[in-house]
From Swiss-Prot:
Its cofactor is Zn(2+). The gene is lpxC. NCBIfam families: lpxC. It comes from the Bacteria. Pathway: Glycolipid biosynthesis; lipid IV(A) biosynthesis; lipid IV(A) from (3R)-3-hydroxytetradecanoyl-[acyl-carrier-protein] and UDP-N-acetyl-alpha-D-glucosamine: step 2/6. The active site is at residue 265. One of its GO terms (biological process) is lipid A biosynthetic process. This is UDP-3-O-acyl-N-acetylglucosamine deacetylase. Its EC number is 3.5.1.108. The lineage of its organism: Bacteria, Pseudomonadati, Pseudomonadota, Gammaproteobacteria, Enterobacterales. Keywords: Hydrolase, Lipid A biosynthesis, Lipid biosynthesis, Lipid metabolism, Metal-binding, Zinc. It catalyses: a UDP-3-O-[(3R)-3-hydroxyacyl]-N-acetyl-alpha-D-glucosamine + H2O = a UDP-3-O-[(3R)-3-hydroxyacyl]-alpha-D-glucosamine + acetate. Belongs to the LpxC family. GO terms for molecular function: metal ion binding; UDP-3-O-acyl-N-acetylglucosamine deacetylase activity. PANTHER family: UDP-3-O-ACYL-N-ACETYLGLUCOSAMINE DEACETYLASE 1, MITOCHONDRIAL-RELATED.
Amino acid sequence: MIKQRTIKRIVQATGVGLHTGKKVTLTMRPAAANTGIIYRRTDLNPPVDFPADAKSVRDTMLCTCLVNEHDVRISTVEHLNAALAGLGIDNLVIEVDAAEIPIMDGSAAPFVFLLLDAGIDELKCAKKFLRLKEAVRVEDGDKWAELAPYNGFSLDFTIDFNHPAIDASTQRYSLDFSADAFVRQISRARTFGFMRDIEYLQSRGLCLGGSFDCAIVVDDYRVLNEDGLRFEDEFVRHKMLDAIGDLFMCGHNIIGAFTAFKSGHALNNRLLQTVLAKQEAWELVTFEDGEEMPLAFRAPSAVLA
């Protein structure tokens, strides 16, 4: 049986908020089976909870925000959400003493490290997966994203950037998902932005935490970071990381094939909401019998040990 997962102990870290540039303390707490993923702002009195839910994603301009019915929001959840998806964490309470998750190094790797340091705990309840039964596709101009039936979780992502620093041969990436593949191939890919955009946003009091420490920064010709790229195709790998986090907003690991061209947070979320609204296109399944398990989600690999 594939079991639900949480962490073994409370783990805490501090970082900087991408938007405010101020210190943020992040605390992750184990949660009981069927709790789901809950983001909590402890800077408010009383604290406000934001369950991970595709319908709560309302603002996708610079990052993924969860917004409740009172217009209270928590920002920059996508990289942590990707780490949870990558490690198959079903139940967790995530507390921050600010309006945003810290940006860390702009990737999911620091969150993976924290979660593995806390230890993965398997619970006694069967893990629920969202399995695609029909293909669902959404489009926005020439951009599109699709989920289709597949016995596992595969991703195929293409970006289309006309930039000297981004070679045409590095604009597509495919992955047959597993926790090990996510940690090694995806989690370290950082977010990226143009120096001119960062300077403009900061002049308006936005993106105050943006720096070379938490993003790949490019000008019109090259990558400006002294250490360069972590992967030759780090840009498209990060877009895949974003998609993994965006799709996990349904609270379940997905069994299906994800394919996208120039997609971003908004289109990824529209795809997820379109799938969920089409009830005949998916089902929630558990795997009591090991023979039925998709390879991608069999017993935790060495990376989780």
